[in-house]
Amino acid sequence: MKLTNLKLTFGFILASCFFSQAAYTQDTATTFKLTQEAIKLRQQGAIGLETFLKSHLSDLTSPPSPEVKTALEQLCQQRDCYASKLYWYTDLEKAKAAAKTSGKPILSLRLLGRLDTDLSCANSRFFRVALYPNSEISQFLRENFILHWQTVRPVPKVTIDFGDGRKLERTITGNSIHYILDNAGRPIDAIPGLYGPKAFLKQLKQTEAIATELSKSSGTKYKSLLQQYHLRQLDGIQNQWRADLSQLGIQSPPQLVENPINLTSPPSARLAGSLAVSKSVVERPIINSIQPETLDVSSNSLKIIDQATWNKLAQLYQNDARLDTNSIALIQAKKLPNTTDRKNLSKVIRNFETVMALDTVRNEYILHRQIHQWFLEENETSDVNKLNEKVYAELFLTPSSDPWLGLANNDTYNAIDNGGIVENPVSRSR
């Protein structure tokens, strides 16, 4: 009897091994086939993506199988592409060629890290959840823009090891910006940081309209139209600022002025992080642990009004930050910890929408206003790479001249050899 049971057990083990191996082989073959298909179709641009989506329509559940999801991300060059269905160029020259053929302007994202990886900078991750999957935004982008992204530099990552097998992985510091370029690659406008979905769509529609108008002109007329546009935007921001504060009972609002941040001070990850609320909520605990609060941030342009007033301003734009059903479905698919209960998930979503609304008003009234001013002055705005250098140095406070992104504070003693800094011999020799 024991021998019979042993034979049966051994038989079940062999059968399990056989079926597991067969399943593994089938999954590997499927992955290889889908990968090859994605590589081939990517060469066809957005048409290739449409072909893939049509041929795999029955596989595009929410979320799809890991194999289909990975293939789509490779084809689109965007993480969670199954939710947005957007095709991105990673070569600006190819994007410009597509723009000239289609007559569409370019939306060029600059970010820390890569858009097709999970751990890109925080704002770009929020774009992938709140903006790109939004049904209205994704359709508008698909129909009216050529999409492109480019890495500014690798995103800093932090791993907290609890010593028992548990780890907490996060990115830290950095910001992102969308540039609107004409089909020759010249900057028309820029949308700095995170905006709520409705506010972002409004920006896209405004910039697409001026891009269309500019495409019909050249020379001095082009220059005049672009300056008139930015002058109107500046006036509109100032008028809206007064109207919003008046609605809050502030009859003599402070004037929006040039960015008063002291650029001679050493770069600070704490100060840079304070510019983007959504990402600072995630990163602040880690930054506070790494970098003691010793710097004077009184010159921060955000101090033009107090935090309580910023919060009240954000409440006026709460509806502009509402997530649509596609974005909420993507959040649910990501299986966040401690959000199995529907009430907990709703709370997470409400909190996210609240900080998005705050980001929206601060980015528009402080950062975008400054960008309009630069365009009006023709201050490093004719070349997207030069403009991007200026934005990251003077608006985002993460200049390319600082390899440590404000995280290495030479004025604070931490009792670690070499301050805990480990340099790459290759980067040191540059």
Residue locations for each model-derived region?
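Bacterial N-terminal signal peptides that target proteins for export
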Residues: 2-10
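Bacterial N-terminal signal peptides
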Residues: 9-20
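Boundary at the C-terminal end of the N-terminal hydrophobic targeting segment
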Residues: 22-25
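Non-globular targeting/processing and membrane-anchoring segments
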Residues: 27-87, 101, 201-430
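Thioredoxin-like thiol-disulfide oxidoreductase module
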Residues: 89-101, 126-189, 197, 202-207, ...
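Short active-site neighborhood of thiol/selenol oxidoreductases, capturing the structured segment around
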Residues: 102-119, 147
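Aromatic- and acidic-residue-enriched segments that line the glycan-binding/catalytic groove
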Residues: 120-125
